[in-house]
Amino acid sequence: SLSEQTLTHTESREEFFQRRENEQKTLTPKPAPLPLPPTASPVPQGENMIEFCDVTVTYGSRHILHHLDWTVRCGERWALTGPNGAGKSTLLSLICADNPQGYACPIHLFGKRRGRGESIWEIKKHIGFVSPEMFSTYRKPLPAIDIAASGLRDTIGLYVRPSQQERELCLEWMERFGAGDLATRDYLSLSDGEQRLVLLVRAFVKQPALLILDEPFHGLDDELTNRARSIIDAYMARPDRTLIMV
């Protein structure tokens, strides 16, 4: 009878649902990772992607960069560290062709001297970029997949409708990062962490030769951070890809 049974375990409602969730994660196999596509605009391995020769940048009387010599070769991985105001953002703006002082500096990007007639888009097509500043810049009421697709043409917002093939490519990248279910949702309705994840996806969609990731894991939980690290490591396994991490 019921009166003869012994109660062996008790748990709160929250503990019960957490246990069921953990059991479900254990029983549900993780999908196989999608294969990574080749680099879209490769640069020959070993060639200089970035070359700064005695570069100085000033704002008023303040020297932000002072006689800087720096060479980044294809296939290398760099980590830029330093306190706020050390010049990291200025350095990245020179690489991404966003700083007008770059025209007057002895800088070579992807084998070409800056200021010799190349457009900024010819430079940006090689670069996938994400930074904390982009989080405050991208305030467009668009589906998340369109925000990711804006990385194909380096725009803030989507001004050229992507082809079906491009949309499928962007969706594949969102699925790699565990963001596939966000694709059709309004970007502005997403949480801060989800928005940052979409912007990280945006950096990868054109399979760039150079990744510049400025605090890429900021706002991501542990699971998404670990997934992103794995994707970055897998992406960088190809010798024609270069990474600058800040």
Annotate each PLM feature.
Residues 106-122, 188:
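ABC ATPase NBD Q-loop/coupling interface
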